[in-house]
């Protein structure tokens, strides 16, 4: 496999800190937290302290919508043609559309991550079948490694890599069952730390 220089191109971050990469960096630089305490009976009982995408600004934020927004922005900003034979797409997630299982009488096809990824790719005009990486918390890094290897192998000339996960009833219940969710904003290196803060968001970039 050839050792060639591979560069990062356009990017977009959608999170509780902002809807663009610039907004996120400004929030981080200014010490503005994305984590807040709120109530949402559709997610869990009682209060939850977590990072949530601002629906008032973004609109309906589901797994596929977030991916389409981020990937579409990267393609538009970079000028990359999703239809070009050398353009690849790698999508990373831990749970994908797991919320589609809620109260479903039968499995929704979108519950299968590969199916959901293909729907996103088709709507954005990609001709290549998307590669899906779902390997817990390392999914995003693994997706970047896979994309780099696709370029080194000559399979693609450029690859858009995207990752997304949502705050869902399933995810929150899972972490709460481990007693690992902090009741306040997490303090990861504090002697009195009491857990983590969950969050949702989506990021995409071009290799």
Enumerate the predicted regions with their spans:
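Conserved "HGTGT" condensation-loop signature of ketosynthase/thiolase-family condensing enzymes
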Residues: 1-130, 149-152, 168, 177-197, ...
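Short beta-strand segments
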Residues: 90-93, 134, 159-165, 207
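Short conserved active-site loop signatures built around small residues
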Residues: 140
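Short, high-confidence coil segments that cap the C-terminus of an alpha-helix
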Residues: 155-157
